[in-house]
Amino acid sequence: SKQFLQHIRQYNSAFQMTSFGCSEDRIPGWQPTFRVKGQIHHRIGSLLNEGNERPVYCQIYFIEDAQEQVRQRNSYFDNLNADVISDVQAVLHKQNRYVSAFKTAAEILSEQNTDDMNLILSATKRPHGTHERRFNIPCTSELGVLMPNDIFNNRDIILRTRSHGRPLQRINECHRAYDALQYPILFPTGSDGWSIDLKLLNPKTGDHSNKQMSAMQYYTFKLMHRDYFNPLLYSGRLLQQYVVDQFVKMETTRLLYLRLNQSSLRCESYDVLCDTLKNNASSNTVGRNIILPASFTGSPRWYHNKLQDSLAYIRKFGSPDLFITTTMNPQDPVVKNCIYTGQRPEDRPDIVCRVFQRHVQEMKKLMVNHSIFGKLSAWLYSIEYQKRGLPHAHWLLWLSRNDRIHPDSVDNIVCAEIPAKEKDAVLYELVTTCMIHGPCGKQFPNAPCMKDGKCSKGFPKPFCNDTTITDGYPTYKRRSP
């Protein structure tokens, strides 16, 4: 239903078995995307709540009365439908293998009347066969085991009967239950997610290879459109959270690899040398840092290399002639054709990014191969993401000597005027729908660009008969009507 999709993140939170810890990045006004700052971590507590504490997360599944479970879940959110909660709860109790494991554990604990038992969800116990594409769901006995002693793998999930003041346990990103415990709405049967034990398959024979399947390979597969129903692609805001969660997981595994392989990356001697030179310290007091190589996207050395590449162009060809920004249009016909009925572009970040990448390649072909701005001596571009989620690209172009733009020809190339509809109806439609800032101003005080009662971008711009440039910022030709 529309109400379910509108509040799908809240419905998932009502049934999730682990907590979702993050610092969400919010902006004033309308925010169609889910953004976080820093790390994401999933945590899980004890099987039973302490004393008079309210049951949370997996503890709610141990409540015997089904209606009391519904009441507890509904009490955390004001905008959920109790009938929908009851229906989803019934499905999970019937189909979800983790819920079945919890119910079995509750029966055993009730019979033995002890607080010394732990429910171990193994990280290394693998289901028979293959994964979700071919895997058979293992039975509950293969999923978890009640153990009285603390004998477990360091990646196992240990659910103690009661916490007795112990802190919440953080779920390892490589655990096969990482996704199923957090997203029961997306994985109602409790199917396994990615783990380091997964191997790639030979597409011709279907046999397992010796190569490990990376998190990126696994989640790329999960996000692709298939001939069968994929609940991920219909989950709207929950898909955004899922994609962000998995990207952070991929980055975490990459950082872990770099931390564990510093010696093979020849970082130790570099680290010690830098510490000694900067701090003028003795060898006994020098600490050890983790070196992120230039191959890690977003690291200081990666940025430094990109900057040096750009400066090399400037040293060779001088200042760039054109600075162009291309922004993704959420109303792009290709995007509308690819998304499902009832969806908005922000519901499918995968489609938006793929379409934008195609447009970037087409733009590159027009500028480099077809020389629409003139013959280029050099060019580069950078892709960024706006706060509201849409990607955009910044281009720097160096024109050849014969195609350089002179000051007296600028107004023939660019201006800030609305074209006449009678002369070019297509251009008029593009400019009026995609190239006009706002609305903002005193009548729209909650607009994202409004700061201290005025537009932070300087709109509306003053009328100008000719383009002028002050301190590197142009005021484009915009004649008074």
Predicted regions and their residues:
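Non-catalytic interaction regions
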Residues: 1-481
